[in-house]
Amino acid sequence: IIFPPKRSKLFESFYEDLIVDYEPLSNRDEYQPSAIMYICGGASSSHPYVQELVEWREKQGYIVYLIPESEAGSSANSIKSFLQNIMVDFDNPPEIVGLIGDTSGSYSIPHFTYGSGATDVEYSYLSGNDFLPEIFIGRISVNSSSDIANLVNKTLTYEKAAHQGNWWFERAALVGDPSDSG
């Protein structure tokens, strides 16, 4: 099985950095339409703010798939298998997968374990025995309905900050945690 079945515009800079003499496609229409999938723990798929997030992504031009965790699987391995299958079965498989839920609690989504900590990166390795991801993976870590409202509202407020100049979208500050912190 070849992943991804269609070339992704979102992965272009990744390809350019990893592949010697990489040639991007000459026509944008040759790329698959951008797609994102949210796998939702608990009842998060019906939450009004999750619905608003889906509507925003659609306005941005994404094909959006909203999948309840009960459909994707109840273990990390079953969710990974689900993702491997959709890469083949969907005409436009997701390039980005967002997990909506914490690693435990009423909105939980299972996780993999690396060392003594939880990790989701394993979900992105869908083909072969390498450490090259076939999808981008992320998690909106929430334990309650109010967590969903707060985090999605912050995300939408940030992304829709039309009152800001272009600098708002071109600069970032990130916080990291050293791996030895546990």
Name every feature range the model reports, one short phrase each.
Residues 1-182:
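Cysteine-dependent hydrolase recognition
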